[in-house]
Amino acid sequence: MKSILWHNLKLCAHGDPNDTIADAAIAVNGDGTIAWTGRASDVPAGYVHWPREDLRGAWVTPGLVDCHTHLVYGGQRADEFAQRLAGASYEEIARRGGGIVSTVRATRDASEAALFEQACARLRPLLAEGVTAIEIKSGYGLELASERRMLRVARQLGERFPVSVYTTFLGAHALPPEYAGRADEYIDEVCERMLPALADEGLVDAVDVFCERIGFTLAQSERVFEAAARRGLPVKMHAEQLSNGGGSALAARYRALSADHLEYLDAAGVAAMRASGTTAVLLPGAYYFIRETKLPPIDLLRRHGVPIALATDHNPGTSPLTSLLLTMNMGCTVFKLTVQEALLGVTRHAAAALGASDRHGSLAPGRQADFAVWPVSTLAELAYWFGRPLCERVVKGGVTVFTRDAR
């Protein structure tokens, strides 16, 4: 690959629409790393004569980061969508064997090749919107062989597509049917057999747990966190989605990368997250899809300075969403975030939620040249439009990996 000077662009280098350069340039080394960013009038002499790529006045942002997804699974759950429309709650469906457990059955029955093919169809729309890094969780296998297949497929997606994939082991997602009434025994299996085996195979970047009334208790969640700590793995938590169970405070005690959902988060949990540097990952797609009514405590998070990230939470039961731009719109319209908060939420703060702030979410010398090109007049349009393709080009490691004739 040759070195390139990208020019005639408007630059939002760090995901903050209030910190931009109107006439900017980006020098990218032949190895795909950024050599320099700044005003076009200040291009250092060493880069002036490099081959140029004219972006015709478009905006450039860091590649987007989807920091919470369940992208790999078998089947779909449109039938449960119809049940919810008829009045059934998420908890009611789960308690009678639907919900997560129905996807577990479909995932266990699917081959690795079938899981890969289905996941590809879900990933492509995200990549076309400028996503260059994504987190993918397991958690629909709930036994070693199926969890392994899910994580292997996630790794394969990162090898086959121009996207950095971060894998999260979510064995403690739900209680599998064969362990009904024996949750502690299942946590034994997660901590003593599944996690060690998958970590030894290099399939796990982080560990998550669903701490909720219909999930796992604080004590069980802590056992999973302890098992992760023994392996030197960072942790995350699904917390306070359906009730205030104190999960966020536990996550903070283990210096979790993130606590996610958080509709029922209280002031004590917010303060704990601030003290531990834990990112709040908000998931407006799930909030919208299950018709939740309790909003996350946005003002408390702001007041305490807790970083807010946004993610699709793509999953078959509560957020079959494959658009991070629509997620931004929902974050603004439903959660009343500002455009600044929404864009930071899918760039810099989303990278922090993955423990990858040194690799993603910002454009600076020495980092990989992962960026998205937007032929819009203002960055507010990224959160304003929905159902309209906006991304003109995606660059990953200095190489154009997606283009759309948007003009």
Curated annotation (Swiss-Prot):
InterPro entries this protein is in? Amidohydro-rel (IPR006680), HutI (IPR005920), Metal-dep_hydrolase_composite (IPR011059), Metal_Hydrolase (IPR032466)
Binding sites annotated in the UniProt record for N-formimidoyl-L-glutamate: 140, 315, 317
Report the EC code(s) recorded for this entry. 3.5.2.7
Associated pathway? Amino-acid degradation; L-histidine degradation into L-glutamate; N-formimidoyl-L-glutamate from L-histidine: step 3/3
Binding site residues for Zn(2+): 68, 70, 238, 313
> What does the entry comment about cofactor binding?
Binds 1 zinc or iron ion per subunit.
The name this protein goes by in its record: Imidazolonepropionase
